[in-house]
């Protein structure tokens, strides 16, 4: 059985599938759920990275590197959420095509700019839509940059704060900042725990 860390990121999305029993496969071979990346040891998000990789939601950019501080893309999140929903994301003209189709069909994203870096507020908004756009009752005024949250993302950010999905950093939400792969892993892990 290959380990998740043995899969190369660029090829991963075109070969990955979710089995009916919840296990993951790579080219039809069940994936062993452990990964060790040289660049995540001691990283603040190491646990979240290991958990999301173990769940088959993420893979490394190489067999030994996760690139935790690299920006995530919109297509990446669409694909990860499609996979989390149990959708087979293999095939398609691009690695993100099946995830993008799923995101558009399910109202999670309009499918635009899949290769663009995803901002923190875009990330939270996609998660919020995935969750069914529940009532938002969190307060953002404890964060010094709350006024920089775009109007389209306000309810999503309030919901994410209220549910502990987003905690901010140094009293800021940084909604306009690009989300790193580590931040996506951490936010996604909290979202998955909340969704159980």
Residue ranges and their predicted role:
Residues 8, 12-46, 59-121, 127-153, ...:
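Feature responds to low-complexity, polar/acidic, surface-exposed segments characteristic
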Residues 44-54:
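Extracellular/luminal Pro/Thr/Ser-rich low-complexity repeat and linker "mucin-like" segments
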Residues 56, 164:
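Phosphate/pyrophosphate-binding loop motifs in nucleotide- or prenyl diphosphate-using proteins
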């Amino acid at each position: 059985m290959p380990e998740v860390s043995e899969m190369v990121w660029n090829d991963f999305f075109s070969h990955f599938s979710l089995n009916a029993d919840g296990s993951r496969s790579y080219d039809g071979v069940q994936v062993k759920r452990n990964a060790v990346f040289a660049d995540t040891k001691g990283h603040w998000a190491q646990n979240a990275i290991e958990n999301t990789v173990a769940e088959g939601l993420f893979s490394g950019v190489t067999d030994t590197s996760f690139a935790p501080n690299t920006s995530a893309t919109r297509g990446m999140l669409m694909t990860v959420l499609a996979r989390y929903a149990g959708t087979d994301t293999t095939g398609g003209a691009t690695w993100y095509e099946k995830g993008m189709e799923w995101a558009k069909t399910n109202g999670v994203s309009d499918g635009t700019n899949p290769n663009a870096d995803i901002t923190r507020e875009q990330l939270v908004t996609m998660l919020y839509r995935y969750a069914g756009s529940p009532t938002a009752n969190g307060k953002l005024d404890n964060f010094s940059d709350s006024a920089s949250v775009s109007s389209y993302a306000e309810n999503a950010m309030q919901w994410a704060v209220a549910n502990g999905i987003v905690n901010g950093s140094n009293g800021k939400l940084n909604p306009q900042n690009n989300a790193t792969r580590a931040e996506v892993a951490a936010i996604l892990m909290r979202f998955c725990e909340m969704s159980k």
